[in-house]
Amino acid sequence: MSLIVDVYAREILDSRGNPTVEVDVTLEDGTLGRAAVPSGASTGAYEAVELRDKDTARYFGKGVKTAVAFVNGEIAEALMGIDATDQVGIDSAMIELDGTPNKSRLGANAILGVSLAVAKAAAEATGQPLYRYVGGTSARVLPVPMMNIINGGEHADNPIDIQEFMIMPVSADSIAEAVRMGAEVFHTLKKELSAAGLSTGIGDEGGFAPNLSSTRDALDFVLKAIEKAGYTPGEDIYLALDCAATEYFEDGRYEMKGEGKTLTPEANVDYLEALVNDYPILSIEDGCSEDDWEGWALLTERLGDRVQLVGDDLFVTNPARLAEGIQKGCANSLLVKVNQIGTLTETLSAVDLAHRNRMTCVMSHRSGETEDATIADLAVATNCGQIKTGSLARSDRLAKYNQLIRIEDELGETAIYAGRSILR
């Protein structure tokens, strides 16, 4: 039996210098599982609640000592002596202990830290890597990365409205080769931006944050970098966008202030369709606001057979929100962020629901990350086939790419890189 004998949380810092929760779970044989919780900048209104202290005299109110205290108190007491391999039972016990629909009492950051640390401890105790423990013997598909190389929106201090401009190296034969391709484009883009007299400072997720004039300006720079790196856009490498449209949706209109545009929901769909017509865009995330169900339905009707339409703020990794979206014909892909829902069990339920409804899934980081690489294992465990974990800079992003390379190496000849199989 892999019985829990200690649950201990501490306050550490994330990649933006803000406090977050780290949890250690120790089993009776001495096995330790450790997990650190990420945090988002552009957060959906329907996400599980991240508990902050709100003590302005400390970390400007962003401390997590309250969440830490809940882990070290109520949660630890409730889980002591429970078998760590009972993930569903443990997650259910924490949800019941919290007693709210959005984990607002104990905090999703407290609950998730424990949930992931339990899984990692159980995997270690059973002598399995995390991806195999969670995903079983079929867990061998390495995901195509969405590499965020230009940042805008809430992730950068520039006038670009769209939050992320990403590249997807689909022609690679392995995750190691995909990372190499991405790195080569990243370094080429840096040279191109520098030659144009633009900033090569990086944003929260490691992408560049130049003072570009428009979405198309950013896309043109990315295309040029792909070509100069020796690759063919739309063949070797595709483009992906995260609009994070909720961030600029005001009073029923899309206020793209960086470009001086005010768009109705229908005009917003027209805008995105024009981009798809002119650029090799494979995926668009949050092209409409989380509350614009009609806009989402129209976008899916117009582009759903050509482009992957990913729901992030729309679904917040919540099976109930996802079921509503499926019923309304909105989006065809689920972005998976473990801290949006707050437990591993609920995350896996959302992925299963998406797959059963023939939707794709994209495992994702948050803009506030740590060196914890759990999502790399989860991307393989769930056979997502795609992962968003930032650019080719910042160790908090590279930790995930490096873990994927290790997993691929460990799987050997049985490893499969998703590659072109994700194309629509």
From Swiss-Prot:
Catalytic site residues? 205 (proton donor), 337 (proton acceptor)
- Could you tell me what the cofactor note in this record states? Binds a second Mg(2+) ion via substrate during catalysis.
According to UniProt, the reaction catalysed is: (2R)-2-phosphoglycerate = phosphoenolpyruvate + H2O
Task: State which residue ranges cross the membrane.
Answer: none
Q: Which Pfam families match?
A: Enolase_C, Enolase_N
Where is Mg(2+) annotated to bind?
242, 285, 312
Which cofactors are required for activity?
Mg(2+)
Question: Which keywords has UniProt assigned to this entry?
Answer: Cytoplasm, Glycolysis, Lyase, Magnesium, Metal-binding, Secreted
Provide a Gene Ontology MF annotation, just one: magnesium ion binding
Which pathway does this chain act in? Carbohydrate degradation; glycolysis; pyruvate from D-glyceraldehyde 3-phosphate: step 4/5
GO CC term, one of those recorded: extracellular region
Q: Which domain of life is it from?
A: Bacteria
Q: Which family does it belong to?
A: Belongs to the enolase family.
The protein here is known as Enolase
Q: Which organism is it from?
A: Dinoroseobacter shibae (strain DSM 16493 / NCIMB 14021 / DFL 12)
